[in-house]
Amino acid sequence: MLSAQQFLKEFNNVESLNESLYEIVSHICEEVKLQGDKALKNYNLQFDQVETEKLELEQSQLKNAYDMLDNETRDALEQSYQRIKVYQENIKVKQESSQQTECYERYHPIERVGIYVPGGKASYPSTVLMTATLAQVAGVNEITVVTPPQNNGICQEVLAACYITGVHHVYQVGGAQSIAALTYGTETIKKVDKIVGPGNQYVAYAKKFVFGQVGIDQIAGPTEIALIIDESADLDAIAYDVFAQAEHDEMACTYVISENEKVLNQLNTIIQEKLQYVERQDIISQSIANHHYLILAQDTEEACLIMNTIAPEHASIQTRAPEMYIDKVKYVGALFLGHFSPEVIGDYMAGPSHVLPTNQTARFTNGLSVNDFMTRHSVIHLSQKTFNEVAESAEHIAHIESLFNHEKSIHVRR
C-alpha cells in the first residue's frame, strides 16, 4: 500500500512504451511498403506460424460464421450491436443549416477506414462491434478489418461480428505489418484513410510510425483501470474488476484508491486469496505482481487528484455517493459510476466505444466515437454586406503582417 505522495512520486517515474521496438517496426513497415502481399505472407509465417495463400476472407465466410452461431451468442452480439448503434446515432453530430448563418460547418464520413482487431491471447468480437458499428453509423463507404491469422482459422465470433456490422473486407494479417498494409496498400489490400482499434506494442508503434501518412485514433498502451472505493463497496466484486483488467495482458495496470486503510487491506487479502484459483492465473498474477497499486488518500480531493493524474482508460467509482465525483474526475477515458456499472459492461454492452485513451492521454484526448469517422470543414459564404463590414479590418491585419497580396485580394473586391 502506498500513500498518495509515495504513489505520485513513483507514478511520475513510470516509463511509457518500449522505444526499442521502434526500429523493428519501422523495418517491417518498409518491407511491406516495398514487397506488398509477399511481405505479409512471410510475416504471417514468421510471427504467427500460419501459411496463408489467400489474405482476404470471402463475404460468404462471414455470413456462414453468423449463421452457425448458437442462439445465445447471436442474441448477445445483436444486443450489443443495437445498444452501440443507438448510442452512436444519438451522439452523431448534426449538419448545420446553411440558411442560418454565413459561416458554418459540414461533416462527411471518411471514405475508407481500417480496423485492427487483436488476436493474441484472446479473440475480440466486441472490438469489431465497438469500432465497425461506429464507422457504419457514420456512413463510411468501405470498412476493412485486419486480424492476425490463426492455425484453426479466424475466430468465428469475430467473423460473425464483422457480418453484423457490415464490414466490407476482412484480411487475415496482424501486427505492425497489417498497419503498414492499410497505410500503403498492397496488391490485395487497399490503402485506407484512417486506422483505428487496439493492439499490442508493435501495433502501437506501427501506428506511431505511419502517423501523418494516414489518420489514427490513438497510440494505445496496455489496458488500465483505476477505482475509487469506500467501505460500502462490494470487495468481492472489486477483486473481479481488478482481475478483469489484469487478464488482458501482463502489462495491464490496476489502481485502487480509498480513504479507508482497512478497506484496502481487506481488498488485498481477498485478491491474494482469489488469485490462487482465478482463471487465466498466469497472466493475472504477473499483472498483479508488477502493475497493481493500492493507494491511501487523505480525503476526496486527494483521491480525485490521484485519479486525474493517472488519467486512466477506465475510472470506476464505487462509493456511497458516486455522483459527487462526476465533476471532480475530469481526465479519464470513461467514467463508470456505482455497483451496477462495472467497467466490463462498458466493454460489451453500455453503448460508448470501449476504444479509449491510455497512458495518461485522457488528459488531452477522448474515447472513440462515431464523430471520429467523419471529417469536418468550415463553409464561408458571405454576402456583399457582410464582406463590406469586415473587409477594412481584414485588409489592415494583412497590411501589418506585410502580406501585401492578401491585402490586395481584399481591396480589389471593395
UniProtKB/Swiss-Prot annotation:
Substrate binds at T223, Q245, H248, H314, D347, E401, H406. NAD(+) binds at Y116, Q177, N200. SUPFAM superfamilies: ALDH-like. InterPro entries: Ald_DH/histidinol_DH, Histidinol_DH_CS, Histidinol_DH_monofunct, Hstdl_DH. GO terms for biological process: L-histidine biosynthetic process. Gene3D superfamilies: 1.20.5.1300, Nitrogenase molybdenum iron protein domain. It holds the Pfam family Histidinol_dh. Its cofactor is Zn(2+). Keywords: Amino-acid biosynthesis, Histidine biosynthesis, Metal-binding, NAD, Oxidoreductase, Zinc. Binds 1 zinc ion per subunit. Signal peptide: none annotated. Its EC number is 1.1.1.23. GO terms for cellular component: cytosol. One of its GO terms (molecular function) is histidinol dehydrogenase activity. Pathway: Amino-acid biosynthesis; L-histidine biosynthesis; L-histidine from 5-phospho-alpha-D-ribose 1-diphosphate: step 9/9. It catalyses: L-histidinol + 2 NAD(+) + H2O = L-histidine + 2 NADH + 3 H(+). Zn(2+) binds at Q245, H248, D347, H406. The active site is at E313, H314. Belongs to the histidinol dehydrogenase family. NCBIfam families: hisD, PRK13770.1. Catalyzes the sequential NAD-dependent oxidations of L-histidinol to L-histidinaldehyde and then to L-histidine. This is Histidinol dehydrogenase. It comes from Staphylococcus epidermidis (strain ATCC 12228 / FDA PCI 1200).
